[in-house]
Amino acid sequence: MKRLLFLFLLAGILINNHALQHNETIDLKKLAKIVLPPAYQTRVIGGRVTTNAKLGGYLVAMRYFNNFICGGTLIHELIVLTAAHCFEDRAEKEAWSVDGGISRLSEKGIRRQVKRFIKSAQFKMVTMNMDVAVVLLNRPMVGKNIGTLSLCSTALTPGQTMDVSGWGMTNPDDEGPGHMLRTVSVPVIEKRICREAYRESVSISDSMFCASVLGKKDACTYDSGGPLVYEKQVCGIVSFGIGCASRRYPGVYTDVHYVKPFIVKGIKALLSRSR
């Protein structure tokens, strides 16, 4: 936690200097929502209400001590794909549970316990590089309004439009998750533009890409770990951002196609140990 507080202070200094140079004001309360748990999570802004059934049943809600923390994607009846940062300071696997087949957080769907999880050894909160984790459930997630997605098969291209869904905040000033499932379509932003936007605060690595309609459509707090979907494939994992639907900073996602070798290896390791 001390390391995260240091990161918050460092980010505040860097971004505040950037703001002074551009005559801007930085809201440190909103910044804390992005840098410190539980808000290293994101939400859908500018979207529409939907249901898990309409989406295909692949979106799951991940809870820690029964508190909603992150979204996730069911990619196998026993495996969930999510963000590594969701597990930061939340290492007790017995305290994690996963709800499937729900559209409202208050609904009772199909609940499974987390048996194991693997996150990339390259992941560090200070860089957010390789923000990816795979989760093994204690029993298969099957039933009504439950489905799976395949992993992204092709590299992303700028302008490509994808759908992001989740229970995240719908307003940057909110204090908790939204209870209704929402979805929004966002385009992939050119990597050069993405890196330029974040150059004063964080390095955009090869494992990341940006997507949003600046100032209008984005993921936000509590959407973290959820999927960015293209043609029934999960191509992105909601990772982080500065603010939500910011005019300057687009949302940042983990590139599933880039991290696919880690995902495939992790799935094999988890399933081999589950037998």
Swiss-Prot record:
Single GO cellular component term: extracellular space
Domain of life of the source: Eukaryota
Class of this enzyme: hydrolase
Biological process (GO), any one: proteolysis
SMART domains assigned to the protein according to its UniProt record, in alphabetical order: Tryp_SPc
Subcellular location: Secreted
Coiled coil, from the record: none
Expressed in which tissues: Produced in the male accessory glands and secreted into seminal fluid.
GO molecular function, one term: serine hydrolase activity
Annotated glycan sites: 23
Residue ranges constituting the Peptidase S1 domain according to the UniProt record: 44-268
Active site: 85, 131, 224
Disruption phenotype annotation: RNAi-mediated knockdown in males results in a number of effects in females mated with these males including impaired processing of the metalloprotease Semp1 and the accessory gland proteins Acp26Aa and Acp36DE, lower levels of egg laying after the first day post-mating, higher rates of sexual receptivity to subsequent males and failure to release stored sperm from the female seminal receptacle.
Signal sequence coordinates: 1-19
EC number: 3.4.21.-
UniProt PTM comment: Undergoes cleavage in the male during mating with a cleaved product detected in the ejaculatory duct and/or bulb of males by 8-10 minutes after the start of mating. Further cleavage occurs in the mated female.
Alphabetic keyword roster: Disulfide bond, Glycoprotein, Hydrolase, Protease, Secreted, Serine protease, Signal, Zymogen
Record-annotated disulphide pairs: 70-86, 194-210, 220-244
UniProt cross-references to InterPro entries, sorted A to Z: Peptidase_S1 (IPR050430), Peptidase_S1_PA (IPR009003), Peptidase_S1_PA_chymotrypsin (IPR043504), Peptidase_S1A (IPR001314), Trypsin_dom (IPR001254), TRYPSIN_HIS (IPR018114)
Pfam families per UniProt: Trypsin
Main location: secreted
Summary of the function given for this chain in its UniProt record: Seminal fluid protease which is required for cleavage and probably also activation of the metalloprotease Semp1. Also required for a number of female post-mating responses independent of Semp1 including egg laying and sperm usage.
Record family assignment: Belongs to the peptidase S1 family.
Name of protein: Seminase
